[in-house]
From Swiss-Prot:
Originating species: Streptococcus thermophilus
Protein name (Swiss-Prot/TrEMBL): CRISPR-associated endoribonuclease Cas2
SUBUNIT field: Homodimer, forms a heterotetramer with a Cas1 homodimer.
Deleted gene: phenotype: Plasmid transformation is still inhibited.
A family per Pfam: CRISPR_Cas2
Record carries keyword Repeat: no
Amino acid sequence: MSYRYMRMILMFDMPTDTAEERKAYRKFRKFLLSEGFIMHQFSVYSKLLLNHTANTAMVGRLKANNPKKGNITILTVTEKQFARMIYLYGDKNTSIANSEERLVFLGDNYCDED
């Protein structure tokens, strides 16, 4: 069986005016983190998926946990396409992973020197 790694990019916009809306926002964000999503920017998350079947299952779980208010946009790309993403920013941030490697160490504290 061959696997085609995919990356689900999820963008959402939810109101946070009332206490109830903020609670719904926190609940949805907590759900995303529990499902293995990684935050790229505020309200932009991604998750590595094994194949199209895993993608379909994740979409089903997202539909089951869809907040009542707000918009959610999902874009699925191959891992190779995701690795070609271009980051534009001011100071260089080395904690962002953008690689085709299967094992990536996140953060500034990793060093392979002894």
